[in-house]
């Protein structure tokens, strides 16, 4: 059975991961393979640490999306893939990989998954999580400080220099490609339940 490929996009801190986790919970983790686009950031080990921090991580070129497309094609053919494991504190790929087995549903989440045409067009369902900019910034600030060892000053500087401009140039315009736009992210239980019900229905149809 050909898997259902789902893309979940939206600005940084919009609630993409929360929505993805809620869908996973409602549909059943045994039915879904989850892949974060963040895992495909390009390895910057060839750069000095101070130069790595200056890279624009919110530009499509910072991600190896062509590798993700290849992995999705492999999963669609029923083959397992080894996805990269990225270290956000050093901005490098580790020597480890994470094995993702084929599943009836493959869910990919990331801010730029609708920007590259080849990646965007591979999805059967495209969801865009739409959340106010101030809420997204606060969430990103808290995440980067707690999980990625960043300072308040560094997060604010990055937000103003690259995150916000790239959101306006790439992320926000990609919303027009979405099949469903979900306001307020993980707090929109009705929308999440509707999406989960649709996925369950598609799985039942394909099982017949």
What spans do the regions from the language model cover?
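Hydrophobic positions on the alpha1 helix immediately C-terminal to the Walker A/P-loop
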Residues: 19
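NTP-dependent small-molecule kinase module
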Residues: 101-102, 142-145, 164-208
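Conserved nucleotide-sensing/catalytic segment adjacent to the nucleotide-binding pocket
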Residues: 33, 42-90
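The conserved Walker
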Residues: 12
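Conserved lysine of the Walker
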Residues: 16
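ATP-dependent NMP and nucleoside kinases share a basic, alpha-helical "lid"
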Residues: 94-148
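Post-Walker A helix-loop "phosphate-sensing" segment adjacent to the P-loop in P-loop NTPases
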Residues: 25-33
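Phosphate-binding/switch loop-helix module in NTP-utilizing enzymes
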Residues: 71-108, 113-114, 200, 206
């Amino acid at each position: 059975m050909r898997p259902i490929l789902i893309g979940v996009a939206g600005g940084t801190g919009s609630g993409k991961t929360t929505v993805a986790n809620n869908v996973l919970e409602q549909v059943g983790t045994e039915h879904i393979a989850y892949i974060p686009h963040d895992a495909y950031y390009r390895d910057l080990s060839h750069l000095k640490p101070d130069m790595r921090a200056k890279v624009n991580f919110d530009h499509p070129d910072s991600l190896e999306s062509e590798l993700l497309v290849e992995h999705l094609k492999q999963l669609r053919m029923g083959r397992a893939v080894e996805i990269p494991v990225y270290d956000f504190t050093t901005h490098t790929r580790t020597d480890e990989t994470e094995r993702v087995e084929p599943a009836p549903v493959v869910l990919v989440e990331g801010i730029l998954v609708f920007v590259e045409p080849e990646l965007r067009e591979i999805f059967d369902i495209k969801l865009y999580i739409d959340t106010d900019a101030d809420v997204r910034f606060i969430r990103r600030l808290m995440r980067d400080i707690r999980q990625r060892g960043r300072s308040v000053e560094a997060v604010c500087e990055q937000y103003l220099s690259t995150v916000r401009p790239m959101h306006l140039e790439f992320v926000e315009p990609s919303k027009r490609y979405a099949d469903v736009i979900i306001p307020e992210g993980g707090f929109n239980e009705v929308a999440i339940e509707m999406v989960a019900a649709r996925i369950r229905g598609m799985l039942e149809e394909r099982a017949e």
